[in-house]
Amino acid sequence: MKTVCYIAHPDVNQSSSQQYLLESGLNYSQAQYVNLYEVMNNLVIEQEQDRLLAAEQIIFQFPMYWYQAPGILFEWINQVWSTLKPSQLKGKTLGVVVVVGGKKEHYQSGGREGRTVSELLSNFEVLARHFKMNYKPIFAIHQFQYINEQQKAHLMWRYLFYLETNEEERLTNYQRFIIARAKTLISEEIATDHNLAPLWQAFISQLEMQEFEIEELMGINLEEEL
């Protein structure tokens, strides 16, 4: 899947969250990244439209500012999307990756903010609907500055899953993705060091066994519900 990820952040180099996401995507996915602050300095609308039309999946990535996306994203949409016809983007996928400074529990019914992140950013769902695009559930990252290394590793895999698939983030789909990506990475490692082959193969076998056990457990739970 050809994914183009548009970053709307005024200083990506000084943002630990954006740097982590960018490095993860560049190193472990085929996604193309576009910095909107750089693009808008010398905007060529035809080139931007060509890039959109060539993509299968379009991702907007940004920090939440006052319950919305940064203004530059809307400025870019206004200039680049306004002359496009819905038929030109029909069937493509639109997704949103948003970094939120507040706690997750604040953004829900009864929480401090009283609205979910999806509700606050519902304008992007309307945009996708207008252009007859498929809209993915929002990928929200809360309080990145407080998560530990293990949580960051989990975040990286979830982020790659979001970038590279249109599947629902169910446990079985997610685990299959990790196994497939791990096999790719492992084959690259083995190509440079054949001594690693037995260790990597054992790792893959363990993942596949866990996948089987999870699928079996989910099947039992489903039968119980029925």
Question: What is each of the regions a protein language model found here?
Answer:
Residues M40-Q49, N148-Q150:
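Structural motif
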Residues Q47-F124:
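Helix-loop-strand module that forms the ligand-binding subsite of alpha/beta enzymes
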Residues M1-A31:
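N-terminal beta1-alpha1 ligand-phosphate binding loop
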Residues Y28-N42:
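A short beta-strand-loop structural module common to alpha/beta enzyme folds
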Residues L22-L26, M133-E223:
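Glycine-rich phosphate/pyrophosphate-binding loop and the adjoining helix
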Residues A8, L36, V99:
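Cofactor-binding loop segments of dinucleotide-utilizing enzymes, especially the Rossmann-like FAD-
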Residues T83-K104, Q201-L226:
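Ser/Thr/Gly-rich flexible loops in soluble cytosolic domains mediating phosphotransfer, phosphorylation
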Residues S118-I138:
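A charged, well-structured terminal subsegment
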